[in-house]
Amino acid sequence: MNIGETERNAVLALLSIYIKGKKYSDCLFFCHLTLEKILKGLVVERTKTHAPYIHKLVDLARIAKVKLNEEQLNHLSRITKFNIAGRYDAFKQTFYKKCNKEYTEKYFNISKKLYLWLKKEYRKK
């Protein structure tokens, strides 16, 4: 296990704490960040270059040549929207209203499943 993997595992553990503490929007942001990090790691591994400074998960998966099914693509597209730092206030307010326990748990579980699947993509030829 390398430092990056240890860090990603720690983030997954932290996310469950955010859910328990009702920090739902933070939890969803970190779901995005965790998937972004693992995808950027795959980009580096497979292209032997630095990962681009982008945050769109579907684009990172494409660059890393990860074969995703339609459901996975849809989930990554939705989870990308959880990275809202530079968005307009109206967008943020709409997002925050969605961030209840059920919505957050749903996407936490989807993110965890995607993360574990992507983890298996390492060293895959």
Predicted regions and their residues:
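Terminal alpha-helical segments
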Residues: 1-125
